[in-house]
Design a protein with these regions (language model features):
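Short glycine-rich anion-binding loops that position phosphate/pyrophosphate groups of nucleotides
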Residues: 28, 85-88, 116-119
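Short, Lys/Arg-enriched N-terminal segments with co-localized hydrophobic residues
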Residues: 3-17
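A structural signal for isolated positions on well-ordered beta-strands in alpha/beta enzyme cores
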Residues: 19-23, 50, 111
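N-terminal beta1-alpha1 ligand-phosphate binding loop
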Residues: 17-44
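Conserved RecA-like P-loop NTPase ATPase core
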Residues: 22, 81, 115, 148
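Structured adenosyl-cofactor binding patch, chiefly the S-adenosyl-L-methionine
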Residues: 123-161
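S-adenosyl-L-methionine/SAH cofactor-binding core of RNA-modifying enzymes
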Residues: 46-110
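A mid-sequence interfacial segment
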Residues: 102-138
Length: 161
């Protein structure tokens, strides 16, 4: 059996289930965007939403504390995808291929991290396994959270065929 066939057989025998995490900085709000986000969360198996608040007025300290919360949400052997306006623009199919590759390499946890109002500090940018953007526009955090949930749903649909 050649290497490619063995890999396909292994993939079929051992379906790794990926647990998704959406971790975000900011207060939970009862907004229309949150309602849509929760509709997508109900459609996706193995997903968690974690929201954190950092209460300090010092921007540098805030960035550092936010980074630690988002980084620490990623399990030890998981992958961290950071949403950042300067990140790489990917198609849904490209992102699905990245996640499928990670899954095929036994990654079971993927954390999509959304920073706070001051953006993302260097610590989390240096720690992230992938930095992506939803275009060059700046989006409200509530909308980004909703868009991430939708993309995870879309990725799972692409992967399942």
């Amino acid at each position: 059996m050649d290497k490619k066939t063995r890999r396909n057989v292994t993939r079929c025998i051992r379906k790794i289930i990926v647990r998704y995490i959406i971790s975000t900085i900011g207060k939970a709000k009862n907004s229309d965007e949150d309602m849509i986000t929760h509709k997508y969360l109900k459609r996706i198996k193995n997903i968690e939403l974690k929201q954190y608040e950092v209460k300090t007025n010092n921007p540098e300290k805030k960035l550092e504390e936010e980074a630690l919360k988002l980084i620490n949400t990623t399990p030890k052997n998981g992958k961290l995808i950071l949403l950042d306006e300067k990140g790489q623009n990917l198609s849904s199919t490209d992102l699905a291929k990245i996640i499928l590759n990670w899954r095929d390499n036994n990654v079971t946890d993927i954390n999509f991290a959304i920073g706070g109002a001051f953006g993302n500090g260097e610590k989390i940018k240096n720690t992230a396994d992938k930095i992506i953007a939803f275009g060059k526009l700046t989006w409200p955090h509530q909308m980004v959270k909703m868009m991430v949930a939708e993309q995870i749903y879309r990725i799972e649909t692409i992967i399942q065929g």
